[in-house]
């Protein structure tokens, strides 16, 4: 049985979906005002790998990941560029789809955009106001944190802890609140900002309400898994829980999953440190599948350290797997040994999607394959395991000239013309084709 580390309970829990053999997942997507950075890619790859493993286990996965296209940052960048917020968002949504495609990330079941859910957002906020969980102040609408049961339970904090942290705030927005911890559900429009009409005047939604509405509209009041980066645990996911459960009276998500950060040369990635790297730029020099493999091979909850050596190692390891995959089939295979690898892989991945251990199994299996155990059954199993990591190797077809040279070399060897055979081997090596003579015939790999 798959076990998931649930942030809410701080424990490993057996995964039991609401509907048998169906997984409903909502993963917070990017705010689309710039190209995604390697930290965004870590989250996208981690949850894509989790989705793929559920599918490997024959679950049907409804995978929802949103685009935040209404946000303070988007408004600021669009104004600076002299374009509309929609033009800016459209540009970076396209860039996101292109970049993540190179990382082998499957398209989501749906990618909802905030601008398409404005009526539903206004209705959601209105319900919270009617139920006394929210109040209007000078055109803004705020959520009453004090009325929420166990607010910040996800972040393992108490209301008292948060109030101490919030003490001393004197900004204009705080003056409009009943409590410094109250957060905006709806923001009154400022001059020149994009806005929508509402019962409280023109404005736009707050960040937290957007995800609650899109998740519940598509997947229902209670979902199986809600995921995102560890930085979203508080306040974003905390506030999602508070407002969603206040509206519905039901548990918002049964499992909360958060991926770890990406460090660059052992320092947390940040713009202030100047080690901020966009995926768009990285893909100009690093193959997308290599970057994907690097990100996928560390267990999703742990931090991962981005270095040139780590990328080089990922490239070398991926090449070994590719060469293994391209080996010609043999008649040799031990079913019991194959089953041992399949069970070891499942054991690793069932343990909170431990991809680090899963990759170890992959390489153990590759070593076994290289010893001659590679019939079609083994190849199919190997490919299915690779696909969990988003790795798909295209069947490489040698051109006719190279095929002809290999045949000529085989004929020369049969005639004991070893000088010709060696010459052809060297000629092929110069073209990047490495030959391996085995009892089952000649195998080749491309350097």
Name what the model sees in each region:
Residues 9-12, 18-104, 437-440, 444:
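N-terminal, positively charged nucleic-acid-binding surface of large information/translation enzymes
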Residues 59, 133, 433:
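Short phosphate-binding/catalytic loops that engage adenosine nucleotides
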Residues 81-87, 108, 301-305:
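Short, polar/flexible loop-turn hinges at active-site or ligand-entry regions and domain interfaces
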């Amino acid at each position: 049985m798959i076990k998931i580390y649930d942030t809410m309970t701080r424990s490993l829990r057996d995964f039991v979906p609401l509907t048998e053999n169906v997984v409903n997942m909502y993963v917070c997507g990017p705010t689309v005002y710039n190209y995604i950075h390697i930290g965004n890619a870590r989250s996208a790859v981690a949850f894509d790998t989790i989705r793929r493993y559920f599918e490997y286990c024959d679950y049907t996965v409804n995978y929802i990941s949103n685009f935040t296209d209404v946000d303070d940052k988007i408004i600021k960048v669009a104004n600076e560029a002299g374009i509309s917020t929609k033009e800016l968002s459209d540009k970076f949504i396209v860039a996101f789809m292109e970049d993540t495609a190179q990382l082998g990330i499957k398209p989501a079941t749906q990618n909802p955009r905030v601008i398409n859910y404005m009526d539903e957002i206004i209705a959601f906020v209105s319900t919270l106001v009617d139920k006394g969980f929210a109040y209007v102040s000078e055109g803004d609408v705020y959520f009453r944190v004090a009325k929420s049961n166990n607010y910040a339970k996800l972040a393992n904090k108490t209301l008292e802890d948060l109030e101490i942290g919030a003490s001393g705030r004197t900004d204009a927005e705080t003056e409009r609140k009943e409590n410094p911890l109250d957060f905006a559900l709806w923001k009154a429009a400022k001059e020149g900002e994009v806005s929508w009409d509402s019962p409280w005047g023109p404005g736009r939604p707050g960040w937290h309400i957007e995800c609650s509405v899109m998740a519940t509209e598509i997947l229902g009041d209670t979902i199986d898994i809600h995921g995102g980066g560890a930085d979203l645990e508080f306040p974003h996911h905390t506030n999602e829980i508070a407002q969603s459960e206040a509206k519905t009276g039901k548990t918002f998500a049964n499992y909360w999953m958060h991926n770890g950060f990406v460090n660059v040369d052992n320092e947390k990635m940040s713009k202030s440190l100047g080690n901020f790297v966009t995926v768009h730029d990285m893909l100009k020099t690093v193959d997308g599948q290599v970057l994907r493999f690097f990100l996928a091979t560390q267990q999703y909850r742990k931090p991962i350290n981005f270095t040139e050596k780590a990328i080089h190692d990922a490239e070398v390891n991926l090449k070994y797997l590719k060469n293994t995959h391209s080996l010609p089939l043999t008649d040799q295979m031990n079913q019991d040994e194959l089953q041992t690898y399949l069970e070891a892989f499942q054991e690793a991945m069932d343990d909170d999607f431990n991809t680090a251990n899963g990759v170890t199994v992959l390489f153990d299996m590759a070593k076994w394959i290289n010893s001659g155990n590679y019939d079609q059954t083994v190849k199919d199993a190997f490919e299915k395991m690779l696909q969990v990591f988003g790795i798909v190797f295209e069947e490489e077809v040698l051109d006719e000239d190279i095929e002809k040279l290999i045949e000529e070399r085989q004929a020369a060897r049969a005639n004991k013309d070893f000088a010709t055979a060696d010459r052809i081997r060297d000629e092929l090596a110069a073209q990047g084709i490495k030959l391996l003579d085995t009892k089952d015939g000649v195998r080749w790999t491309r350097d």
